[in-house]
UniProtKB/Swiss-Prot annotation:
<dbReference type="GO" id="GO:0004222">
    <property type="term" value="F:metalloendopeptidase activity"/>
</dbReference>
<comment type="function">
    <text>Functions both as a chaperone and a metalloprotease. Maintains the integrity of the outer membrane by promoting either the assembly or the elimination of outer membrane proteins, depending on their folding state.</text>
</comment>
<dbReference type="InterPro" id="IPR030873">
    <property type="entry name" value="Protease_BepA"/>
</dbReference>
<feature type="active site" description="Proton donor">
    <location>
        <position position="203"/>
    </location>
</feature>
<keyword id="KW-0482">Metalloprotease</keyword>
<feature type="active site">
    <location>
        <position position="135"/>
    </location>
</feature>
<feature type="binding site">
    <location>
        <position position="199"/>
    </location>
    <ligand>
        <name>Zn(2+)</name>
    </ligand>
</feature>
<keyword id="KW-0862">Zinc</keyword>
<feature type="binding site">
    <location>
        <position position="134"/>
    </location>
    <ligand>
        <name>Zn(2+)</name>
    </ligand>
</feature>
<keyword id="KW-0479">Metal-binding</keyword>
<dbReference type="InterPro" id="IPR001915">
    <property type="entry name" value="Peptidase_M48"/>
</dbReference>
<protein>
    <recommendedName>
        <fullName>Beta-barrel assembly-enhancing protease</fullName>
        <ecNumber>3.4.-.-</ecNumber>
    </recommendedName>
</protein>
<dbReference type="InterPro" id="IPR051156">
    <property type="entry name" value="Mito/Outer_Membr_Metalloprot"/>
</dbReference>
<dbReference type="Pfam" id="PF01435">
    <property type="entry name" value="Peptidase_M48"/>
</dbReference>
<dbReference type="Pfam" id="PF14559">
    <property type="entry name" value="TPR_19"/>
</dbReference>
<dbReference type="GO" id="GO:0061077">
    <property type="term" value="P:chaperone-mediated protein folding"/>
</dbReference>
<keyword id="KW-0574">Periplasm</keyword>
Length: 486
């Protein structure tokens, strides 16, 4: 039932003409581009604005993982798929929620959310990519906007209530489903039918996106089969089947379409294996996910898997605060790959865990000679500067980082720490305000910026900048209030 609502779609207008016909499927199986069919309900600008609103609400209420390495990985993977999709009119943003239930969804503004459990239950990168391709296809086909049109035909609906229930579902699936059911009321059956059609449509288009992006198209039916098998042996089906209906026809259709494509077995990237190790070792309720059996299996596998096993062992040792053992395991890996950001990030954490900020700073500065624009290294170095009591250096680097990545709370939080250490109260307040604004706490953010403005010289450039930002946030707050009332 949620699947239609859980998926946003704002995109239209093909990226490249003829991309759908490049030997992917027989002509009769190709799907028409229907991305513009929902234009009567919401414009792209309106969807973008609503997406911004709900992303901010999500930051405030959902257990998002703000891990720079994982954020960079899922956005790189996601945008690789987006580059091979049609009807893309907005940027895409991918988020990771710390949730042990298998699920993913998309909503307004090209925003796609993955549960961390997907890394636990996917056997390879193609399976993970198949989930992303499915959600991206929901977006490019504008299924959420089309669902709104369908709902308007069936019965009035408060869409803020629906999307609010979606966000609640991330933290508490049962409560979210209950809230959604109450909102949908008597129109449920029509929406359910519409949803099942959307799911199959997203599968069909997603398989094409998957293949064009260089992944194995069989990964989609394989993962769907895995979900179906799991539901047969447990009393409660996987959460993903509650939000993404899986009738037999959907599974058989996905398998048939994948079988029509040229086989394309694809090895998982090193980054996928590292990300899997990191999530198993650092996130989720199960502290025993990085089992000796799994690490032993990987250590006997391919070269990439062997390297992932060593990284996983180092993560495990770091989490147990066995810093010397973790360092001894990681040091040879760094010697072989001195620019590897996964190794550099973990070694920085080990250094800071042992109060060796000077060593971390020296290593990161050396790495940034060749990777000056690498955001993961910038954040690591800024954090090392803060921990090493070099706030001036941190502030300089973080001004650059927050300018390039204004929607990352990590940068603003570190900047607030650094400016506080320097006694720059107005700048600290402004940085804290930006972090609050990203979580939708606009009234509080405006209050902090007003305080910052009052602390600087009357008529100064700093005051003009703070006041201009206050005006922006006030306008944004007024717009968001309309969404909350609608």
């Amino acid at each position: 039932m949620i699947a239609t609502l859980l998926s946003s779609l704002l995109l239209t207008g093909p990226i490249s003409a003829g991309a759908e016909t490049q030997g992917l499927l027989p002509a009769q199986d190709l799907l028409p581009d229907i991305g513009t069919s929902a234009g009567a309900t919401l414009s792209i600008d309106q969807e973008m604005a609503m997406g911004d609103f709900y992303v901010r609400q999500m930051r405030a209420s959902a257990p998002l993982i703000y891990d720079p390495l994982l954020t960079q990985y899922i956005n790189t993977l996601g945008n690789r798929l987006v580059a091979n999709a049609n009807s893309v009119r907005t940027p895409f943003h991918f988020y990771l929620v710390n949730n042990d239930q298998i699920n993913a969804f998309a909503f307004f503004g090209g925003n796609v959310v993955l549960h961390s459990a997907l890394f636990r239950y996917t056997d390879n990168e193609s399976e993970l990519a198949s989930v992303l391709a499915h959600e991206i296809s929901h977006v490019t086909q504008r299924h959420l906007a089309r669902a709104m049109e369908e709902q308007q035909r069936l019965a009035p609906l408060t869409w803020v209530g629906v999307l609010g229930s979606i966000l609640l579902t991330m933290a508490s699936p049962q409560a979210g489903m209950a809230g959604l059911s109450g909102t949908l009321a008597g129109a449920q059956q029509g929406i359910i039918s519409f949803t099942q059609g959307n799911e199959q449509e997203a599968d069909r288009i997603g398989i094409q996106v998957l293949q064009r992006s260089g992944f194995d198209p069989q990964a989609m039916p394989n993962f769907l089969q895995k979900l179906a098998d799991q539901s047969r042996y447990v009393s409660k089906p996987p959460e993903m089947l509650l939000t993404h209906p899986l009738p037999d026809s959907r599974l058989s259709d996905a398998r048939n379409r994948a079988n029509q494509m040229k086989p394309h077995p694809t090895a998982s990237s090193q980054d996928y294996l590292f990300a899997k190790m990191r999530i198993l070792g650092m996130y989720g309720a199960d502290e025993n996910s990085l089992t000796p059996e799994l690490l032993d299996k990987l250590s006997k596998g391919t070269v990439r898997e062997q390297l992932a096993a060593k990284y996983g062992q180092a993560v495990q040792l770091y989490q147990a605060k066995k810093y010397d053992e973790a360092r001894n395991l990681l040091q040879p890996l760094l010697a072989q790959q001195p620019g590897n950001i996964w190794f550099l990030d973990l070694m920085t954490d080990i250094d800071l865990g042992q109060n060796k900020s000077a060593a971390a700073i020296a290593r990161l500065q050396n790495a940034m000679v060749k990777q000056n624009d690498e955001p993961v290294l910038q954040l690591n170095l800024a954090n090392a500067y803060v921990q090493g009591r070099q706030p001036a250096a941190a502030i300089k680097l973080l001004h650059r980082y927050t300018f390039a990545y204004p929607n990352d709370p990590n940068g603003w939080d570190l900047l607030a720490q650094a400016t506080a250490t320097q006694g720059l109260r107005d700048q600290e307040l402004a940085a804290r305000a930006e972090s609050l604004a990203l979580s939708g706490k606009l009234t509080q953010a405006i209050g902090l910026l007003s305080d910052a403005s009052a602390r600087v010289k009357l008529g100064s450039l700093e005051q003009a900048r703070y006041d201009a930002r206050i005006d922006q946030l006030r306008r944004l707050n007024e717009r968001f209030r309309k969404y909350q009332k609608s």
